[in-house]
């Protein structure tokens, strides 16, 4: 079997409809477009979401929410990562050394029951501790 010898399975392909080629074809005269109207004209194409004059779904539904311009901090539960408790000073770099985080992370928030105890060790303005204010 070679690539040039491949053929589609029998019955899987159909002849294309030749529009406007006589009454006997079943698609002659108006070429399956009916009589008159906007859709029968040449160059007609319907807008995405057009529902025939009915209010489109995307306009019927309410707008939802917004996108904040401020970056969300990467949240770490101190109870789950005990290695953070043993650090002498807490910065984004030192947390990255004990816990695998993406390089794109710039702000970190530490949460958990014992997170308040770590507030004195935080030496980076990009690291915050829950309930430490």
UniProtKB/Swiss-Prot annotation:
This is Large ribosomal subunit protein uL15. GO terms for biological process: translation. Part of the 50S ribosomal subunit. Belongs to the universal ribosomal protein uL15 family. Keywords: Ribonucleoprotein, Ribosomal protein, RNA-binding, rRNA-binding. SUPFAM superfamilies: Ribosomal proteins L15p and L18e. The keyword NADP does not apply. The gene is rplO.
């Amino acid at each position: 079997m070679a690539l040039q010898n491949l053929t589609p399975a029998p019955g899987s392909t159909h002849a294309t409809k030749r529009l406007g080629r006589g009454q006997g074809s079943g698609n002659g005269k108006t070429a399956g477009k009916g009589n008159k109207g906007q859709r029968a004209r040449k160059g007609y194409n319907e807008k995405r979401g057009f529902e025939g004059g009915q209010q489109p779904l995307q306009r019927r539904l309410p707008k939802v929410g917004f996108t904040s311009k401020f970056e969300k901090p990467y949240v770490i539960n101190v109870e789950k990562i005990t290695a953070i408790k043993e650090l002498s000073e807490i910065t984004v770099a030192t947390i990255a050394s004990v816990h695998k985080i993406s390089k794109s992370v710039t702000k970190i928030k530490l949460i958990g029951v014992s997170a308040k105890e770590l507030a004195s060790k935080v030496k980076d303005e990009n690291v915050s501790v829950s309930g430490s204010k």
